[in-house]
Amino acid sequence: MKFNYPTGSKATTPKMSQAKVSMPPIYGKRGMSLEEELNESNAYYLSHGVAVIHKKPTPIQIVKVDYPKRSAAQIKEAYFSKASTTDYNGVYRGKYIDFDAKETTNSTSFPLSNFHEHQINHMKDCEKVGGICFTIIKFVKLNKIFLLKTKDLFQFWDSKENGGRKSIPLSVFEEQGYQLEYQMNPLIPYLKAVDKIIENL
Protein backbone atom coordinates (compact mmCIF):
# COMPACT_ATOMS: atom_id res chain seq x y z
CA MET A 1 0.00 0.00 0.00
CA LYS A 2 1.33 3.46 -0.89
CA PHE A 3 1.05 6.55 1.27
CA ASN A 4 1.47 10.15 0.09
CA TYR A 5 2.82 12.55 2.69
CA PRO A 6 1.90 16.30 2.67
CA THR A 7 5.28 17.10 1.06
CA GLY A 8 4.41 14.92 -1.89
CA SER A 9 6.95 12.23 -1.07
CA LYS A 10 5.85 8.63 -1.18
CA ALA A 11 6.43 5.78 1.21
CA THR A 12 5.56 2.13 1.05
CA THR A 13 4.78 -0.20 3.91
CA PRO A 14 7.23 -3.13 3.86
CA LYS A 15 5.95 -6.61 4.53
CA MET A 16 6.47 -7.99 8.02
CA SER A 17 9.44 -10.33 8.13
CA GLN A 18 9.78 -13.23 10.52
CA ALA A 19 12.45 -11.40 12.48
CA LYS A 20 10.96 -7.93 12.72
CA VAL A 21 7.84 -5.86 12.33
CA SER A 22 8.52 -3.17 9.73
CA MET A 23 6.46 -0.01 9.55
CA PRO A 24 6.79 3.38 7.81
CA PRO A 25 9.69 5.38 9.30
CA ILE A 26 7.86 7.66 11.73
CA TYR A 27 9.69 8.92 14.80
CA GLY A 28 8.28 8.87 18.32
CA LYS A 29 7.11 12.03 19.98
CA ARG A 30 10.02 14.03 21.33
CA GLY A 31 10.53 13.86 25.06
CA MET A 32 8.18 10.92 25.61
CA SER A 33 9.40 7.96 27.61
CA LEU A 34 8.76 4.40 26.45
CA GLU A 35 6.10 4.10 29.14
CA GLU A 36 4.28 7.18 27.85
CA GLU A 37 4.50 5.90 24.28
CA LEU A 38 3.07 2.54 25.28
CA ASN A 39 0.32 4.17 27.34
CA GLU A 40 -0.70 6.20 24.29
CA SER A 41 -0.60 3.09 22.09
CA ASN A 42 -2.72 1.14 24.58
CA ALA A 43 -5.24 3.99 24.72
CA TYR A 44 -5.58 3.73 20.93
CA TYR A 45 -6.02 -0.05 21.08
CA LEU A 46 -8.68 0.34 23.78
CA SER A 47 -10.61 3.10 22.01
CA HIS A 48 -10.73 1.04 18.81
CA GLY A 49 -11.80 -2.19 20.52
CA VAL A 50 -8.58 -4.01 19.68
CA ALA A 51 -7.28 -4.87 23.15
CA VAL A 52 -7.66 -3.98 26.83
CA ILE A 53 -4.15 -3.52 28.21
CA HIS A 54 -3.28 -1.24 31.13
CA LYS A 55 -0.28 -0.10 33.12
CA LYS A 56 -0.25 -1.83 36.49
CA PRO A 57 -0.34 0.49 39.51
CA THR A 58 2.69 0.31 41.80
CA PRO A 59 1.61 -0.99 45.23
CA ILE A 60 2.54 1.50 47.98
CA GLN A 61 1.88 1.84 51.70
CA ILE A 62 1.05 5.42 52.69
CA VAL A 63 2.61 6.41 56.01
CA LYS A 64 2.13 10.16 56.31
CA VAL A 65 -0.41 12.51 54.72
CA ASP A 66 -0.76 16.27 55.16
CA TYR A 67 -3.96 18.19 54.52
CA PRO A 68 -3.00 21.79 53.67
CA LYS A 69 -6.55 22.31 52.45
CA ARG A 70 -9.73 20.51 53.31
CA SER A 71 -10.19 19.50 49.68
CA ALA A 72 -6.56 18.50 49.09
CA ALA A 73 -4.20 15.91 50.50
CA GLN A 74 -0.44 15.59 50.08
CA ILE A 75 1.37 12.30 50.57
CA LYS A 76 4.53 13.09 52.55
CA GLU A 77 5.85 9.59 53.17
CA ALA A 78 5.16 6.25 51.51
CA TYR A 79 6.87 2.91 50.92
CA PHE A 80 6.56 0.17 48.36
CA SER A 81 4.29 -2.34 50.11
CA LYS A 82 5.54 -5.26 48.01
CA ALA A 83 7.69 -5.93 45.00
CA SER A 84 5.96 -5.02 41.76
CA THR A 85 5.79 -7.60 38.99
CA THR A 86 5.62 -6.48 35.36
CA ASP A 87 4.48 -3.17 33.90
CA TYR A 88 1.47 -4.11 31.77
CA ASN A 89 -1.25 -6.73 31.53
CA GLY A 90 -4.56 -7.24 29.81
CA VAL A 91 -6.44 -9.21 27.17
CA TYR A 92 -5.90 -9.46 23.40
CA ARG A 93 -7.59 -11.93 21.04
CA GLY A 94 -8.88 -13.84 24.05
CA LYS A 95 -5.37 -14.26 25.43
CA TYR A 96 -3.96 -12.96 28.70
CA ILE A 97 -1.06 -10.61 27.94
CA ASP A 98 1.62 -9.68 30.48
CA PHE A 99 4.82 -7.79 29.72
CA ASP A 100 7.50 -5.46 31.01
CA ALA A 101 8.96 -2.39 29.29
CA LYS A 102 12.53 -1.22 29.78
CA GLU A 103 14.81 1.49 28.40
CA THR A 104 18.59 1.47 28.16
CA THR A 105 21.16 4.07 27.12
CA ASN A 106 23.56 1.27 26.25
CA SER A 107 24.00 1.00 22.48
CA THR A 108 25.46 -2.50 22.19
CA SER A 109 23.58 -4.63 24.72
CA PHE A 110 20.81 -4.68 27.30
CA PRO A 111 21.96 -5.19 30.92
CA LEU A 112 20.00 -7.95 32.66
CA SER A 113 20.39 -6.02 35.92
CA ASN A 114 17.35 -4.05 34.73
CA PHE A 115 15.24 -7.09 35.59
CA HIS A 116 14.56 -8.52 39.04
CA GLU A 117 14.20 -12.20 39.85
CA HIS A 118 10.58 -11.81 40.98
CA GLN A 119 9.69 -10.29 37.59
CA ILE A 120 11.21 -13.22 35.73
CA ASN A 121 9.47 -15.70 38.03
CA HIS A 122 6.16 -13.88 37.55
CA MET A 123 6.39 -14.18 33.76
CA LYS A 124 7.34 -17.85 34.04
CA ASP A 125 4.32 -18.46 36.28
CA CYS A 126 2.01 -16.66 33.83
CA GLU A 127 3.22 -18.75 30.92
CA LYS A 128 2.71 -21.98 32.86
CA VAL A 129 -1.04 -21.25 32.96
CA GLY A 130 -1.31 -20.16 29.33
CA GLY A 131 -0.48 -16.46 29.44
CA ILE A 132 1.56 -14.71 26.75
CA CYS A 133 4.56 -12.83 28.13
CA PHE A 134 7.33 -10.80 26.52
CA THR A 135 9.42 -7.70 27.07
CA ILE A 136 9.66 -4.47 25.10
CA ILE A 137 13.10 -2.85 25.15
CA LYS A 138 14.03 0.60 23.87
CA PHE A 139 17.63 1.43 23.00
CA VAL A 140 17.33 5.16 23.61
CA LYS A 141 20.49 6.37 21.86
CA LEU A 142 19.70 4.26 18.80
CA ASN A 143 15.98 5.13 18.90
CA LYS A 144 15.22 1.45 18.32
CA ILE A 145 12.50 -0.58 20.02
CA PHE A 146 12.30 -4.36 20.10
CA LEU A 147 9.85 -6.93 21.40
CA LEU A 148 11.71 -9.96 22.72
CA LYS A 149 10.02 -13.27 23.45
CA THR A 150 10.40 -14.64 26.97
CA LYS A 151 12.01 -17.79 25.59
CA ASP A 152 15.03 -15.71 24.59
CA LEU A 153 14.93 -13.57 27.73
CA PHE A 154 14.79 -16.62 30.02
CA GLN A 155 17.68 -18.25 28.18
CA PHE A 156 19.98 -15.32 28.92
CA TRP A 157 18.64 -14.86 32.45
CA ASP A 158 19.18 -18.51 33.38
CA SER A 159 22.65 -18.39 31.84
CA LYS A 160 23.49 -15.30 33.93
CA GLU A 161 22.36 -17.09 37.07
CA ASN A 162 24.87 -19.83 36.25
CA GLY A 163 27.80 -17.49 35.66
CA GLY A 164 27.10 -16.52 32.05
CA ARG A 165 27.11 -13.05 30.52
CA LYS A 166 25.13 -10.34 32.27
CA SER A 167 23.61 -8.68 29.23
CA ILE A 168 21.76 -9.48 26.01
CA PRO A 169 23.64 -8.34 22.87
CA LEU A 170 21.88 -5.98 20.49
CA SER A 171 22.40 -8.58 17.76
CA VAL A 172 20.04 -10.96 19.62
CA PHE A 173 17.27 -8.37 19.49
CA GLU A 174 17.95 -7.75 15.80
CA GLU A 175 18.05 -11.44 14.87
CA GLN A 176 15.55 -13.05 17.25
CA GLY A 177 13.29 -10.19 18.32
CA TYR A 178 10.71 -8.09 16.53
CA GLN A 179 11.74 -4.53 15.72
CA LEU A 180 8.88 -2.10 16.29
CA GLU A 181 8.97 1.06 14.23
CA TYR A 182 6.91 4.12 15.05
CA GLN A 183 3.75 4.85 13.08
CA MET A 184 0.88 7.32 13.38
CA ASN A 185 -1.66 5.19 15.25
CA PRO A 186 -0.94 3.32 17.36
CA LEU A 187 2.40 4.97 18.03
CA ILE A 188 4.09 1.64 18.82
CA PRO A 189 2.26 -1.16 16.96
CA TYR A 190 3.53 -3.95 19.20
CA LEU A 191 0.42 -6.12 18.85
CA LYS A 192 1.48 -6.95 15.30
CA ALA A 193 4.44 -8.77 16.85
CA VAL A 194 2.12 -10.41 19.39
CA ASP A 195 0.09 -11.69 16.44
CA LYS A 196 3.19 -13.52 15.23
CA ILE A 197 3.72 -15.01 18.70
CA ILE A 198 0.11 -16.23 18.82
CA GLU A 199 0.42 -17.75 15.34
CA ASN A 200 3.37 -19.83 16.53
CA LEU A 201 1.77 -21.13 19.73
Curated annotation (Swiss-Prot):
The record marks 102 as: Transition state stabilizer. It catalyses: Endonucleolytic cleavage at a junction such as a reciprocal single-stranded crossover between two homologous DNA duplexes (Holliday junction). Keywords: Cytoplasm, DNA damage, DNA recombination, DNA repair, Endonuclease, Hydrolase, Magnesium, Metal-binding, Nuclease. Its main location: cytoplasm. SUPFAM superfamilies: Restriction endonuclease-like (SSF52980). Its cofactor is Mg(2+). Its EC number is 3.1.21.10. Mg(2+) binds at residues 85, 87, 100, 119. Endonuclease that resolves Holliday junction intermediates in genetic recombination. Cleaves mobile four-strand junctions by introducing symmetrical nicks in paired strands. Promotes annealing of linear ssDNA with homologous dsDNA. Required for DNA repair, homologous recombination and chromosome segregation. This is Holliday junction resolvase RecU. It comes from Pediococcus pentosaceus (strain ATCC 25745 / CCUG 21536 / LMG 10740 / 183-1w). The gene is recU.
